[in-house]
Design a protein with these regions (language model features):
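Feature marks short, highly hydrophobic, charge-poor N-terminal signal-anchor/signal peptide-like helices
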Residues: 1-11
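Acidic, low-complexity proline/glycine-rich segments
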Residues: 10, 14-21
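Conserved non-transmembrane functional hotspots
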Residues: 19-154
Length: 154
């Protein structure tokens, strides 16, 4: 009888040990998966924010060049060619904006990113050089502020 009880206790101990080991392994695996998921999302956000900032800079640069092409005599380049290039860069900026909006959980950041794109789009829509210079500064500062805000969401 003692042998049967000892065997039963040994079997229960083995089962309990196996169950605890399984539970600890599952917790460790779950933590690893969660960490990996968070890190991948962080990397995707970093990439999206970087691509968007770069697209805004390129689009802004094209619009500044367009303003000079339209208002300088003689124009440094054909305004129509620069305008087409600006449209292409605007499309790239909009695509990058959509990616930022999909990846960020903060609605305010998404709205701020959209507002900066609208400001950049309007940078060349003036005939006044002082207003143009003010818009250039405002858009440069807006992009810098957006980058600093986005860093907090990584």
């Amino acid at each position: 009888m003692e042998t049967i009880i000892a065997s039963g206790i040994a079997v229960l101990g083995t089962l309990l040990g196996s169950g605890l080991t399984l539970a600890f392994q599952q917790r460790a695996t779950d933590r690893t998966h969660e960490f990996t998921r968070r890190e991948k999302l962080r990397q995707e956000r970093l990439d999206a924010y970087s691509v968007y900032a770069g697209a805004l800079i390129n689009y802004r640069r094209a619009l500044v060049h367009l303003w000079f092409c339209e208002h300088e005599q003689p124009p440094p380049e054909d305004p129509d060619a620069v305008r087409v290039r600006a449209y292409d860069l605007r499309s790239a900026a909009q695509e990058a904006l959509f990616r930022v909006q999909m990846l960020t959980a903060d609605e305010e950041l998404g709205r701020a990113a959209e507002a900066v794109l609208a400001e950049v789009t309007a940078v060349h829509k003036t005939d006044s050089r002082p207003e143009f210079v003010e818009r250039r500064v405002r858009t440069r500062d807006g992009i810098a502020h957006l980058i600093n805000t986005a860093k907090q969401h990584l």
